[in-house]
Swiss-Prot record:
The keyword Nucleotide-binding applies. The lineage of its organism: Bacteria, Bacillati, Cyanobacteriota, Cyanophyceae, Gloeobacterales. Its main location: cytoplasm. This is Acetyl-coenzyme A carboxylase carboxyl transferase subunit beta. Pathway: Lipid metabolism; malonyl-CoA biosynthesis; malonyl-CoA from acetyl-CoA: step 1/1. Keywords: ATP-binding, Cytoplasm, Fatty acid biosynthesis, Fatty acid metabolism, Lipid biosynthesis, Lipid metabolism, Metal-binding, Nucleotide-binding, Transferase, Zinc, Zinc-finger. One of its GO terms (biological process) is malonyl-CoA biosynthetic process. Component of the acetyl coenzyme A carboxylase (ACC) complex. Biotin carboxylase (BC) catalyzes the carboxylation of biotin on its carrier protein (BCCP) and then the CO(2) group is transferred by the transcarboxylase to acetyl-CoA to form malonyl-CoA. Acetyl-CoA carboxylase is a heterohexamer composed of biotin carboxyl carrier protein (AccB), biotin carboxylase (AccC) and two subunits each of ACCase subunit alpha (AccA) and ACCase subunit beta (AccD). It comes from Gloeobacter violaceus (strain ATCC 29082 / PCC 7421). It is found in: Cytoplasm. GO terms for molecular function: acetyl-CoA carboxylase activity; ATP binding; carboxyl- or carbamoyltransferase activity; zinc ion binding. Belongs to the AccD/PCCB family. InterPro entries: AcCoA_carboxyl_beta, Acetyl_CoA_COase_Trfase_b_su, ClpP/crotonase-like_dom_sf, COA_CT_N.
Amino acid sequence: MDLIEWFKDRRKNGRLSKEERQREIADGLWTKCVSCAALHYTKDFQLNLCVCPACGHHERVGAPERIPQLVDPDSWVSTDDHLLANDPLGFNDIKSYPERLAQAREKTGLSDAIVTGLATLEGRPIALGVMDFRFMGGSMGSVVGERITRLVERATAERRAAILVCASGGARMQEGVLSLVQMARTSAALQNHRSDRQLFVSVLTNPTTGGVTASFAMLGDIILAEPKATIGFAGRRVIEQTLRQKLPEGFQTAEFLLKHGFVDRIVERAQLRPTLARILRLHGVGQVQAYRPSPQASLAQEQQ
């Protein structure tokens, strides 16, 4: 239902009272695109995977929304949820690190900035990790690094394809060098995975920056990206001030990186699952259970 249809429906069924209007606004009935400012009925926007029908802008989605978009129904088994961050450095800025962790957990319902687990995709076994930017900017601390390392090691041991969906501002400053060490740990686990000739696919979403870009995010055998995702290490302003020169237009976008060979393919969100499924098939990842695609999935495969 778009905006015009909604107004027609309201005209037909009568006007809303002031209380009803306030309730619908408060309940988030409408979603405004941050790119083109188009207004969309929230349920329709979510059914469209949080992609603006007007301009194609890909809104950020959290891990709880992303996982069902990718895995087979009833196949997801979370791993390492019990791992929780503490405060090894006693870090304080405006707020203490434990306070920030508590606020992030209350806001997102997550225990840290990544959710990991085992699942199947079209009946093929995968080890999937999905980062959530809402949790302290998707920053990588010791728990995020540990979960990724364990996930990849489990994928290697069980001969599963590893898939990581990245969304991060980089290393978590509240953990200092303990956060930076995770760059090496995750990279080492992925090198062992590659040495065992197992597949790793990295999916870069908006934004993927800092220490995550400098480590596991760019180590995929195949690197996919969502349209117009910001991908880089330092920010544009920092680089321009350091180099004292203007950067090219579109620098640090998925399209720029694709043009210069750092990304293999840009994939719209609706096509991400069928694209991953096709990659698994082409790389010989066998099915462990029968898979019967829905009519929508069958149509998507035919269109590829």
